[in-house]
């Protein structure tokens, strides 16, 4: 436990930021999983494209604001795009 008042404040701030970061990353995981579920279920391509766009939008936002590394955001976008393109060819 912190002994100084400033250390207590930093601990509180750190806990709040940690909770926010976890929530944002969880939202991203949910969006990516939703797209993958649609692909696995054989949903129509327009539905998969909507899920793809929302996941990419979230990835861009988190990458720009440094919640995840920009290269990781780019890599995930590329992976999702590859899944979407292969899904289009399979039909």
From Swiss-Prot:
Alphabetized UniProt keyword annotations: Ribonucleoprotein, Ribosomal protein, RNA-binding, rRNA-binding
Ranges for region Disordered: 1-25
One cellular-component annotation, GO: small ribosomal subunit
Pfam families xref list: Ribosomal_S20p
A Gene Ontology biological process term: translation
UniProt record similarity statement: Belongs to the bacterial ribosomal protein bS20 family.
Name of this chain's protein: Small ribosomal subunit protein bS20
Originating species: Chlorobium phaeovibrioides (strain DSM 265 / 1930) (Prosthecochloris vibrioformis (strain DSM 265))
């Amino acid at each position: 436990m912190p002994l100084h008042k400033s250390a207590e404040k930093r601990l509180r701030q750190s806990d709040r930021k940690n909770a926010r970061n976890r929530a944002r990353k969880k939202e991203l995981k949910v969006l990516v999983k939703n797209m993958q579920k649609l692909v696995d279920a054989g949903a129509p391509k327009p539905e998969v494209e909507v899920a793809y766009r929302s996941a990419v939008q979230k990835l861009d936002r988190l990458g720009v604001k440094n919640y995840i590394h920009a290269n990781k955001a780019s890599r995930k976008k590329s992976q999702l795009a590859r899944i979407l393109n292969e899904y289009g060819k399979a039909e």
